[in-house]
Amino acid sequence: VIRTLSGFLGLESDWDFLPWPHEEVERRPPPAAESSDVLLGYSMGGRLALRILENTSFPKAIIVSAGLNAPDDERKKRDEAWARRFESEDWSTLMRDWNAQPVFGGHVLDRREEDYDRAELARQLREYSPAVLPPPELERIETPILWIAGERDAKYVDIAKRAVARLPRAELWICPNAGHRVPWEQPDSFVSRLRAFIESNMFPPR
């Protein structure tokens, strides 16, 4: 089973293109890993997955387009501004502006207001901001990790390279012709690379 931790505004159904059974992890309690489970975290979910992996081992994990938490007053202010907008602003305007952020490179995912609790979205922006959560202790993570970034997502390519250099058991894949939303921009390449990682014995059990 692929245990997914989606990014902000992510839905469990976003992962229906995967050829494996999958289920979304609750963000708060750390999941107990079964012997064949793979943890997959995207963007904000990737940062939360790293927190889980500091204390819970999985057979393998996949981190996609994730940043690294670090104190940042300006980022905290930006996330607070977004949180306030998510509490009350017109949804269509909000989605237009959210998807227009340079990090997404023009790739738009359709999102319907009825699928969300606005108060919960605002809470996530405040509580899971990379400016609020503690920096990950990557050196502590023993789970084998495949870290993925899109080649057009320069900031997150740099983060991925630095993270993989610190992780004890990790490999890096830069996805061609993709930006931040790798799984949905290049789904076939994404699935192919995940399959190779899941089936490989590059990191045998210790």
Would you name each region that the model predicts?
Residues V1-P29:
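Conserved HGGG/HGGXW glycine-rich cap/lid loop of the alpha/beta-hydrolase fold
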Residues G41-G45, A49:
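Gly/Ala-rich beta-loop-alpha elbow adjacent to hydrolase catalytic centers
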Residues E54, P59-E87:
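Flexible "cap/lid" loop of the alpha/beta hydrolase fold
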Residues L109-E137:
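Hydrophobic, aromatic-rich cap/lid helix
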Residues I141, W147-A149:
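Short beta-strand/loop motif that positions the catalytic acidic residue
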Residues A154-A160:
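Conserved alpha/beta-hydrolase "acid-adjacent" motif
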Residues A165-R181:
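Catalytic histidine neighborhood in serine/cysteine hydrolases
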Residues A178-V191:
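Catalytic histidine-centered segment of alpha/beta-hydrolase-like enzymes
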